[in-house]
Amino acid sequence: MRRVTDSRADEVALNRALWAVVNERFTDAAADELWARPDAVWGLFEVPERELGVFGEVAGLDVLELASGSAYVSAWLARMGARPVAADLSGEQLATARRLQRRLGPVFPLVQCDGERLPLADGCVDLVVSEHGAAAWCDPQRWLPEVARLLRPGGRLVFLTNSHLSALTVPPEEGVAGEALLRGYAEAYRVRWPGGGVEFHPSHGDWVRLLRVSGFVVEALHELFAPPDRADHPFYEIVSPQWASRWPAEELWVARRA
């Protein structure tokens, strides 16, 4: 059985504790509206999937939502005809997902596990999706090879994460991204926040290299801006809509397993 290093195990435990708090303060209450949405959206400012088209035709596909949180993306995909499995580190967030499955449906498997070590068989899925999950909270040198193991040949990986530029300009203590660079280019690769939690924000070059060595071919990178008239996010202090109207708030990557 593979083991994680003590330092990484400590980071995973720290992230698990952080997301228990976040679920209590925000994600549990927010999940009802997200599960009930008729159409899929992406990111802090809810960019419609119909404008991006990154899912493609998912009916009949086996899908893994990695670091799923309350699994609302899996709910959207299930309604589109996919067969999702949602996996997350946080038992609290998966409890929220179960509550919404009972209240709204649909029902699909929920798995509590580390996104860097998944208890699933090789070649078991056609599509892996992660919306602000694995890309920020898991070590890319661990989770990308794991996803490659799970995907069938030609399967796709679609993941959303904070933009590298936002990671360079978010203050270390509190507040949203500004116009000054507060970290060196490589310093954002691994960020340990004072309030708890360890995030990963590789540069574009890092992502391309990491994806290639894990057996992926990059198909697209969508840089997401805030649409006009968007309000501040009700909970996450990352970027303001004013900032995100000028610079990309998030990056949506699409890659295919070779």
What spans do the regions from the language model cover?
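A short acidic, Gly/Pro-enriched loop at the edge of an enzyme's catalytic core
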Residues: 116-127
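Conserved class I S-adenosyl-L-methionine
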Residues: 156-189
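Short alpha-helix
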Residues: 198-221
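Class I SAM-dependent methyltransferase SAM/SAH-binding core
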Residues: 62-117
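A short glycine-rich, Lys/Arg-flanked "PGG" loop and its adjoining helix->strand segment in the class I
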Residues: 141-156
